[in-house]
Amino acid sequence: MAYLRWRRFTELASLDRPWLGELFMRKRNKPIVAAPVEKWDAEYQDGIYDRLSRSEQRHHHRLLAAVIADRWPNPRVLEIGAGEGVFYEALRAHRPARYVGVDFSRPAVERGETRLAPEIAIGEVKMVLGDGRTFATDETFDVVVFSECVEHLGEVEDLVAHYAPNLKPGGAVGLTMWLALKPLRLWHRLKVLGEVLDEAVINTPWGGGWLIAVVRPKI
């Protein structure tokens, strides 16, 4: 318990003191490597991620959805790394005008199509099989969301540049990230790419923690 408290203290302190995170980071020179799609496919088929639908696992989704809707009523949202569209279920209460969810796992997308079938039928929602690093569309959005996936999508600067053309004027990038020292490196890099409109941290009694943020890139 003492270690967990110390770790959370260090994570929170490193939000505005990057040097502190570097000091205490384990395996700081080992890059984050994304798991192959076959692993994700198998885990979705086995129901490993069913737990992500539980209420205690979705506080960060609800907060990010509310923050987005506060700035962009009836928002148009593109989510990269959408899995089976769990974030949309938090966004639904805010009556989004359009939601496109992209994931490279076919089982995840198929489950999302089943989960969100009523909204798909009326054209409000679209689930797409695609690689989040290279996905392309002619649609524009108020917000492009990366929920707990940005660390698996390559260089954050390249990622933001790739999706900048899909942002409407005044649009932004939305982010949720597990509160851990190595992923926070990417948050520090993302912050300097634009204006931070919102930033918050969620802690839970069971020990979970997330960063949520909205950043308007300099385009």
Describe each model-derived feature in a short phrase:
Residues 143-154:
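A short SAM/SAH-binding and catalytic strip from SAM-dependent methyltransferases
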Residues 74-83:
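Conserved class I S-adenosyl-L-methionine
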Residues 136-144:
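A short acidic, Gly/Pro-enriched loop at the edge of an enzyme's catalytic core
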Residues 48-63:
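Conserved SAM-binding loop and adjacent beta-strand
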Residues 84-132:
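Class I SAM-dependent methyltransferase SAM/SAH-binding core
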Residues 158-169:
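A short glycine-rich, Lys/Arg-flanked "PGG" loop and its adjoining helix->strand segment in the class I
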Residues 2-46:
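N-terminal, positively charged/glycine-rich alpha-helical extensions of SAM-dependent methyltransferases
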Residues 170-178:
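Conserved beta-strand signature within the Rossmann-like core of class I S-adenosyl-L-methionine
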